[in-house]
Amino acid sequence: MTVYLDSFFSRLKTERLPWRGFSWGSVENEMVGMRDEFGSFSNPISNDPKYIFLIPLISRAKAKDWIVVCQLLKVTLEALVSQSNPNWKAIICGQNSPDFELNDCRVEFLKFQDHEPTTNKFDKFEKLEQCIQHIKETHPADGFLHVLDADDVLHKEFVSFVLRHPNLNVFIINKGFMLAPGGRNGRYLAPRDVTKFRLVSDTLADSCGSCMSCYFDTREGGLEFKLFHALAKQSHGWFEHLAILLGRPLVQVPFPALIYNVLHGNNDYGGRVQPPQLSVEHVKYISDNFTTL
């Protein structure tokens, strides 16, 4: 019963509209059905867990502006290079390599093997699966997988925080910023404070898919990539309560740790408008902690 209550209260804080927390469907039933399986993996976390970013890159043919795509990716990678803890690796998977040198040995480009090439096909998850197969073949170990969109920017202490607090489950970034070009307009995104009446909740996880780190373990007896596969294709606003139902409750990153860039012309839905001006405190926080902005 505690698991169900924890899931419910998680949804009250994180669902954009609170009454959605009362809904229950096939996805929730599926997670509950897998809980016993996820409780059967007992390998302890290693002394040197790997942190691997998976970056699916849109094709040149599908991109609205390939030059902008590459510029944004470069900023994303610069934020990784600026991490205070250097123990990470990034795998970029796409049809086309970016138009700049990948001059850090921790960053690898993986040519996407597209068996049914079409310009408009949604191929993000195929690219992620190719990355995972590559990890199976080249990185037999345990650690964390983090899907990072090629236009999002991480706080410089993020990797350090995760590797200082390793656990066998999931990390979630629920606090961060939506940021428009120029760095002055945006929104602070965070869970609803249940002690205050606020109808709409804008969490980072609800807005941005780059919000989750999943533990993996390819050692003998390990859970392999099962946790990632159970969660990654679900709505990213649901990662938190679904992980609870799996019996793998996540760890909240306690500080605003991600910037979700908008209005650059390559990831926007129709009708998105310029967000309001950020407070002076938020602009300073971004300047102090996101070293490439």
Question: Where in this protein do the model-derived segments appear?
Answer:
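Active-site-proximal specificity loops/subdomain of glycosyltransferases
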Residues: 96-142
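Conserved catalytic core of nucleotide-sugar-dependent glycosyltransferases
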Residues: 137, 155-229
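Hydrophobic targeting segments
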Residues: 49-57, 79-80, 88-92
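Short, flexible/disordered intra-domain loops and linkers
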Residues: 60-71, 118-122, 226-231
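Short beta-strand-to-loop acidic/aromatic patch adjacent to the donor-nucleotide binding site
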Residues: 139-153
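Short, acidic, metal-binding catalytic loop of nucleotide-sugar glycosyltransferases
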Residues: 69-87
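C-terminal catalytic/acceptor-binding lobe
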Residues: 3-35, 44-48, 217, 221-293
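Short hydrophobic beta-strand elements that form part
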Residues: 54-55, 63-64, 146
